[in-house]
Amino acid sequence: MELPIAPIGRIIKNAGAEIVSDDAREALAKVLEAKGEEIAENAVKLAKHAGRKTVKASDIELAVKRM
């Protein structure tokens, strides 16, 4: 896992949880990493299609919209 667990716990608490288990933090981190990689892969394809090596915020935003 590459995402730090503490911010994941804060995300869950910001959603209304009072207490968050380590298992819950790790589970959400795995899901977010998988979705993040999927979005990044699609953004890279969009940048390449546009003839660029640089992935821009607009590539990320479009990749998310296409999901």
UniProtKB/Swiss-Prot annotation:
Q: Keywords for this entry?
A: Chromosome, Cytoplasm, DNA-binding
User: Where do the TM regions start and end?
Assistant: none
One GO CC annotation, please? cytoplasm
Keyword DNA-binding set for record = yes
Subcellular compartments = Cytoplasm; Chromosome
Which residue ranges does the record annotate as region Interaction with DNA? 53-56
> Would the keyword Amino-acid biosynthesis turn up in this protein's UniProt record?
no
Q: Which SUPFAM superfamilies match?
A: Histone-fold (SSF47113)
Which InterPro entries does the record cross-reference, listed alphabetically? Archaeal_histone_HMF, CBFA_NFYB_domain, Histone-fold, HmfB-like, TAF_TATA-bd_Histone-like_dom
GO molecular function terms attached to this record: DNA binding; protein heterodimerization activity
Q: Where is this site: Interaction with DNA?
A: K13
Q: What does this protein do?
A: Binds and compact DNA (95 to 150 base pairs) to form nucleosome-like structures that contain positive DNA supercoils.
Q: How does it assemble?
A: Homodimer or heterodimer with HmtA1 or HmtA2. Dimers then assemble into higher oligomers, with the DNA wrapped around the protein core.
Q: Which family does it belong to?
A: Belongs to the archaeal histone HMF family.
Protein name (Swiss-Prot/TrEMBL): DNA-binding protein HMt-2
Organism ancestry:
Archaea, Methanobacteriati, Methanobacteriota, Methanomada group, Methanobacteria
